[in-house]
Amino acid sequence: MPLVNSKKMFDAAYKGGYAIGAFNVNNMEIVQGITEACKEEKAPVILQVSKGARAYANHTYLVKLVEAAVHECPEVPIVLHLDHGPDFETCKACIDGGFTSVMIDGSALPYEKNIEVTKKVVEYAHKYGVTVEGELGTLAGIEDEVSHAVGSYTRPEEVQDFVSHTGVDSLAIAIGTSHGAYKFKPDQCTRNEKGILCPPPLRFDILEEVSKRLPNFPIVLHGASSVPQDYVAMINEFGGKLSLIHISEPTRQAEIS
């Protein structure tokens, strides 16, 4: 099976009530470990590459590693995805270089500018059968050069307009998760009755409202590696219907432990 884009994968995930794992990769060991696990579990997977990984490992090497995984695990549907593409040029380079899915992260831009750059990427990507993930709202934290001191929640009233004007295939939203190993600074937290610092609460109400406004549409959650399992159950309860969950930090921690 050759590399695939995410469209059919997301459709199956939404109908089946499960989410696809998207794992950041930057070397042979991580690619091997993830794809072999997916082979055992008979699970589809998205292997994603950040801007930092492209700089560290070289675009061509990473593409060839993933192509090797496709060859070794032909029964596993694999998407090669750009994570947090910062601009049109980076997305275009990945599309031209063999990626089957890209994310354009215009979340820090003014709303209209985000629409403009996202639409430009979508129009180019769709010519080549490449799927596109957009983003509304920003996550706090630092991970692979994606840095925001303060996060901003997604505004549900914007999601329908954004999707209709850009033509994106999936949408990443911000409900209070955070990038990186060190999720929140003390001044971003509150203290409970025992004086223990507690991170900002996850905004399940936003997730619920977005799901109502975008029925049958793939919703993506970044910064999800530290979300407790009981919260995952709550996400489903509130109609999350998440089609994609991004995981980065645990794979790096596992590699060095």
Regions found by a protein language model. Give the residues of each.
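Acidic-and-aromatic substrate-binding clefts and catalytic sites of carbohydrate-active enzymes
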Residues: 55
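A glycine-rich helix N-cap at a beta->alpha junction
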Residues: 72-80
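Single conserved hydrophobic/aromatic residue that forms the stacking wall/gate
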Residues: 245-257
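Histidine-centered catalytic micro-motifs
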Residues: 21-27, 80-85, 218-231
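Glycine/small-residue-rich hydrophobic helix-like segments
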Residues: 195, 205-244, 248
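N-terminal amphipathic alpha-helix/helix-capping segment at the start of soluble metabolic enzymes
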Residues: 1-21
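Alpha/beta enzyme core
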Residues: 6-10, 28-48, 52, 61-73, ...
